Design a protein with these regions (language model features):
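A structural "domain/chain start" motif
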Residues: 4-59, 63, 122-127, 151-160
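Short, well-structured beta-strand/strand-turn elements
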Residues: 60-72
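Short secondary-structure boundary motifs at beta->alpha junctions and helix caps
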Residues: 100-105, 113-159
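Hydrophobic beta-strand residues in large extracellular and virion-surface proteins
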Residues: 26-28, 54, 79, 110-112, ...
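Surface-exposed short loop/turn segments
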Residues: 69-120, 130-133
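Short coil/turn segments at secondary-structure junctions
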Residues: 34-42, 94, 130-138
């Protein structure tokens, strides 16, 4: 019985590994902060949060990693991002006005390049925190909405 269980677990691990071969890879670099923008968050922590967020949103089509694989089997895309503006949220305004006003917001500019360095997505967006995630920790409340926006743009670009 134990051997059978070990065999099944090994087979499952092998099938997961084989199914990920050939899928395009998205490498998520740490975002940078534009000159003059004071952002109270750690960009490396934001990167570590973006990777699993993008895995959830794009995991069926792409392998999402934080570092470029040494021997990639398929297409490799690289995500570069910059926070070009940031506005802190206003708790009093959220409490009094409601309806999502006073949320933390950030202006982001990001691009995705293919292996040859050709830009396949070049976008500038304003991202606001989700209404239900107002009290997040040290990388702020923007990781999830940034990942949602980037995943949406990748789907729109129909990368393969």
């Amino acid at each position: 019985m134990i051997r059978l269980l070990g065999f099944i677990v090994g087979l499952a691990a092998l099938s997961v590994n084989l199914s990920s071969q050939g899928r395009p890879v998205v490498v998520v670099n740490a975002f940078t902060v534009a000159a003059g923008v004071e952002l109270p968050y750690d960009m490396e922590l934001l990167q570590k949060q973006l990777v699993p967020e993008l895995k959830v949103l794009l995991g069926k089509q792409f392998d999402v990693v934080a570092e470029r694989p040494q021997a990639a089997q398929g297409t490799v895309y690289v995500l570069y991002g910059e926070i070009s503006g940031w506005r802190a949220g206003n708790a009093a305004k959220r409490l009094i006005v409601g309806l999502g006003s006073g949320r933390e917001a950030s202006d982001i500019q990001y691009r995705i390049t293919d292996a040859s360095g050709t830009t396949v997505v070049d976008q500038k967006d304003t991202v606001r925190t989700n209404f239900y995630s107002q009290q997040a920790g040290s990388s702020g409340t923007l990781a999830h909405p940034i990942a949602q926006k980037i995943a949406e743009r990748i789907r729109d670009a129909r990368l393969k």
